[in-house]
């Protein structure tokens, strides 16, 4: 009998949760009702004012920041707030920064994540229902160069690719600029120029009944930037994106940090924090008490184990365990919760899930139908010690 059947797993191969591998895992958010409700309330309010979410979440490694991002995507796609009048177009990216990265690198990552085909399709749909595409694009972008480049995205071949390179912020040669009928490369005027183009794309999305929202993970990467001018340009890009006037491009940024001061300095400067709003900086802490650990584990087991099959197995094999803690005996479950809570900084979702999985694998390897205290005593110190 394989591992899945051994523990009556519900359509999965292990106790591991990873929404990057299994998108359906995004629906899970165990043991943190207060934080979940707070973030969702902030999201709902954000579509009223400023019109899109602008938020930073932070916590230690393994605290569940990535799961939070994917869960928020699941929420927006399945329970879209009434105040969001367009369909959310949600895009994930893991930020990558090196010592000399600047606003151009950040902009490129955002635009490339969005993709040429998406923006071109928006322009095509706009063209199909407007009498004057030039006028519409100038109204959307508020800039002649951006409107001309956007119009060229409809073209196939080299000219369409050239227009996309312009929006990505590449420096174009004079003859390439002439082909696009633009007077300069995007970004020649600085970081704000690139933000204006991105916000213009957001307004284009709105004309197509979509709301553009970026979910950016691993923002601790900003600490890799060592050049002063590069850091300032990144800060300017974020400050401009956080301006109240931007109601078209939303963002939720996730960063490793034990406190606000642990984050990259550009994320927490006063001018950024006042624009984003102090209540939109949300900590994802470890589980604070043994009771919270118990709730997390029970909710996890209830979701990942097929309850009817497990109940039948418990009865047929006289396992003498409760369905609430299966496949752990009551004593083993208590021992695991105690280990996890000894050091509050280690009571993290990643550690708890790993402990459950490792204990289950050990029991399966020994052909034991349930997890007893001796297995927990062997595994838990390696994870929480």
Identify the residue ranges that each predicted region occupies.
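P-loop NTPase nucleotide-binding core
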Residues: 48-208, 349, 363-366
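Glycine- and acidic
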Residues: 24-25, 53-58, 220-224, 338-341
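A short, basic N-terminal segment
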Residues: 1-55, 75, 372-373, 377-385
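Active-site-proximal structural scaffolding
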Residues: 50, 194, 231-234, 345, ...
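Alpha-helical scaffold elements adjacent to nucleotide-binding pockets in ATP/GTP-utilizing enzyme cores
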Residues: 38, 42, 67-75, 102-114, ...
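The catalytic "switch" region of P-loop NTPases
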Residues: 1-14, 18, 36, 172-328, ...
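C-terminal alpha-helical "lid" subdomain
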Residues: 151-152, 274, 291, 295, ...
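Alpha-helical repeat scaffolds in large eukaryotic proteins
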Residues: 44-47, 73, 77, 199, ...
